[in-house]
Amino acid sequence: VIPGSESRVDAVDGGTVQLTINSDLQWYMQQMIAEEAQAQGAKGGTVTVVEVGTGKIRAAAEWPTMDPNDLDASSPETWTSKLFTYPFEPGSTFKAVTAAAVMENAGVTMTSPTVSASSHEKFENGAVINDAFVHPTFQYTLAGALIDSSNVALSKFGTMVSPDVRHDYLERFGVGETTVGFPSETSGAVSYTHLRAHETGRNL
């Protein structure tokens, strides 16, 4: 380019990007998680709304967060998304993995057999499992265990399949893998050597 002259390059249209986020729902979730986290005295909180039939993320809110137009007003810790870059424990959603494994490999149905489970039990390897509420010993069907979200009962159902089967189902359900391809997204970790029949999801 000769000094003092101009060089013109016509713009090229970019691609089309369409978010799955519902803006109204996103705004509401953002307000809700901020209010609830502060009301509970929590250091932070996240909430994700996923459309079950498609897997589309309709809202992904967290607190504390930052204003991209005013980074100086926020802590560097808020400059990334904890929703995608921090690993988290699957919790009671993990019970679906256990249920699928025993139904397809151990002949378990929603109504038979039953397992005897109290709200607090110690397993053979020393692990102690508790339910969220205190209750006497119940004879749980798989359906009942899922309805009550019983950690103890689901752990007992989980002993009906081998560690190899459990590990296979973890992989088939995508546990320990990235999801949406977000920059720096973590995949989490699933250790086969530490896989135990009574894990309910809190220890992964």
Task: Outline where the language-model segments fall.
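Extracytoplasmic/periplasmic proteins that interact with beta-lactams or build/remodel peptidoglycan
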Residues: 1-43, 66-69, 77-78
